[in-house]
Amino acid sequence: NFLQILIITKLANGEVLAPKHKDHPLSGDWVGHRECHIQPDWLLVYRYDNDVLVLALSRTGTHSDLFGL
């Protein structure tokens, strides 16, 4: 998907995502990960390793797919 690749490219380049993507840190079992919205109910969970441009993509899916909500 073009939009997913665009967002991953921005994250890999250290760019800040537009506010519509609601990029934010996660808590609980997901501490150390971040989540952004590719589309309103299509999420990307990711994390950076040691503040370097190593992007570890964790999961993508809807809120229900990822968190059972």
Language model features with spans:
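Basic, Lys/Arg-enriched alpha-helical interface segments
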Residues: N1-P40, D49-L55, H63-L69
